[in-house]
Amino acid sequence: MTAASEKTTRRFTIDCTKPASDSLISPSDLGAFLQQKIKCYTGKKEKLLHINANGNIVEVDVTGGFIGKQGLKWQIGRFLHMKKLRAFIKIFAQGLDGFELRYINVEEGKEE
């Protein structure tokens, strides 16, 4: 890594408003899962990764770029799979640094 990439900080936002309003998932549970599962350099996780759950939005601050948007999306997918919600909730991109969790309309996929 270069010195410039170590100092850059990216903030990812995960909007859990729709599933959290129905009490399917808790944003604090998602934040705790991400804190536990995201791998980092030994002993440096506290400095490089900060996760805050404010209301229905989870904010992930990453310093150094050790996890990107695709890796974070994969971890969110693992969380939904663990909660057995992967078949009902899909992860959509929301801008360059954000995600939104929405319900999948199962009826659209059926042919008549």
From Swiss-Prot:
Pfam families to which the protein is assigned, alphabetical: Ribosomal_L22e
Keywords per UniProt: Cytoplasm, Ribonucleoprotein, Ribosomal protein
Keyword Ribonucleoprotein annotated: yes
Localization, UniProt: Cytoplasm
GO molecular function: RNA binding; structural constituent of ribosome
Biological process, per Gene Ontology: cytoplasmic translation
Main localization, broad class: cytoplasm
Family, similarity comment: Belongs to the eukaryotic ribosomal protein eL22 family.
Protein name as catalogued: Large ribosomal subunit protein eL22
Phylogenetic lineage: Eukaryota, Fungi, Fungi incertae sedis, Microsporidia, Unikaryonidae
